């Protein structure tokens, strides 16, 4: 299972706020989650998405297109991929592994 850190930046909006575009992206992600393709987490600065890498590329393309569908002419999307293949860990398990070190030194 891979994890994608994605930031979709609509360019040329009518103001500094992009919340309405991000809300639309979250709605699209909810649809993919309902299909069982992904899990995701919204943060103040990005969205984390986990799933099969093939599905993640499909999802990233879909959310990249959303601002264009609303009439914008430019969108910048930043993507980071964590694709670990020796172990299968989801986002929550990765956080718990770090918390274990914080709480008891990893023992």
UniProtKB/Swiss-Prot annotation:
Protein name listed in UniProt: UPF0045 protein in glkA 3'region
Record-level GO cellular component terms: cytosol
Domain of life: Bacteria
InterPro entries assigned to the protein according to its UniProt record, in alphabetical order: MTH1187/YkoF-like, Thiamine_BP, UPF0045_domain
UniProt organism field: Staphylococcus xylosus
Family: Belongs to the UPF0045 family.
